[in-house]
């Protein structure tokens, strides 16, 4: 089973496809120095990028690159690091409209991170529409 793990920050993005049986990384995407001078890599190889220096645009490129690199492999689930789950979320949760709205409502508690985390969730749903998404909250630890 292959799991996509997404960690969107205010100045960097990391996304890895993990083989849950061997626990090895199959595909690794990273983007650093957003928005100043983005550097994108897939499996440690630079990706030429001349687009907008936004998390939204860069994440689209990253997730589409991952999808292409998967070839015939199928992702079974997507996990998202989310900074703040408030008092409502103390463990991982399947993301639905209610969870997305809760993350939105908690932006005041994590104004630099929760909006970016939501972009990650929304982009993953666009690129991998039929795959379940799970939020894992920093506040659960």
Question: Which residues does each PLM region occupy?
Answer:
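Extreme N-terminal starter segment of soluble prokaryotic enzymes
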Residues: 1-4
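Conserved active-site and cofactor/substrate-binding residues in soluble primary-metabolism enzymes
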Residues: 53-57, 94, 98, 115-119
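Short beta-strand-loop/turn "lid" adjacent to the catalytic site in phosphate-handling enzymes
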Residues: 66-113, 134, 140-141
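Phosphate-binding/catalytic loop of phosphoryl-transfer enzymes
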Residues: 114-115, 121-141
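A generic structural motif
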Residues: 19-27, 71-74, 130-131
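Short glycine-rich, Thr/Ser-proximal phosphate-binding strand/loop in the N-terminal lobe
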Residues: 12-53
């Amino acid at each position: 089973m292959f799991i996509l793990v997404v960690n969107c920050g205010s100045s960097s993005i990391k996304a890895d496809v993990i083989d849950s049986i061997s626990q090895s990384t199959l595909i690794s995407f990273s983007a650093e120095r957003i928005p100043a001078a983005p550097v994108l890599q897939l499996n440690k190889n630079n990706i030429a990028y001349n687009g907008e220096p936004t998390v939204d645009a860069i994440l689209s490129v990253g997730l589409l690159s991952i999808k292409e690199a998967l070839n015939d492999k199928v992702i079974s689930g997507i996990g998202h690091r989310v900074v703040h789950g408030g008092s409502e979320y103390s463990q991982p949760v399947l993301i639905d409209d209610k969870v997305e709205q809760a993350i939105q409502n908690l932006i005041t508690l994590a104004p630099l991170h929760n909006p970016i985390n939501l972009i990650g969730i929304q982009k993953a749903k666009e690129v991998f529409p039929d795959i379940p998404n799970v939020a894992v909250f920093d506040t659960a630890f």
